[in-house]
Amino acid sequence: MLIDVELTIMRGERVGIVGPNGAGKTVLARLLAGDLAPTEGERWAGPSIRVDLLTQTAEELPLERTPIEIVRNARPLPESAAVALLVRFLFDVEQIRRPVATMSGGERTRLRCLLLMLTEANCLILDEPTNHLDIPAVEALEAALEGYDGTVIAVSHDRYFLDRIADRIVDVRDGDVTAYEGGFSAWERGRSGP
């Protein structure tokens, strides 16, 4: 449970959300996304904010469709452009023509991350985006986020990932939320004291 939380996130910020298991990180992400309503108080987002949320599971992917079909359905692209995007997210030519049902958890996460990049969202909220990803896939995600000019909010236990993508850390702990400037390493130094 989160109590008396006040948090402002500005356009273009890169925010990492950290804290112990069960502290409410996913709840905070869902509140920020508008996927969950607060029981008290309010969530306010500017009228031009368009949010997309990457959950810890990729259940929203149609299992019978192939990655190439899903990408081309998300945005009308020539097949060669869709293939190039999929390759950028480390899919090989065989994988892009197999149904999602045959894909691993990491492959589904990569596909969902790619789809986020194709949305009209100007705020991406990622809940444990590096789960199930190997190092090359995490690096591909980092590169895609570097090229994204909107706001990124990422719940993660991956210290290296947060150091690479976050310019502010929000610590969720004991029902409270505290913001720290800098990436994960700066947050860790600040918590441990001088």
Model-derived segments and their meaning:
Residues M1-P194:
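ABC ATP-binding cassette signature C-motif
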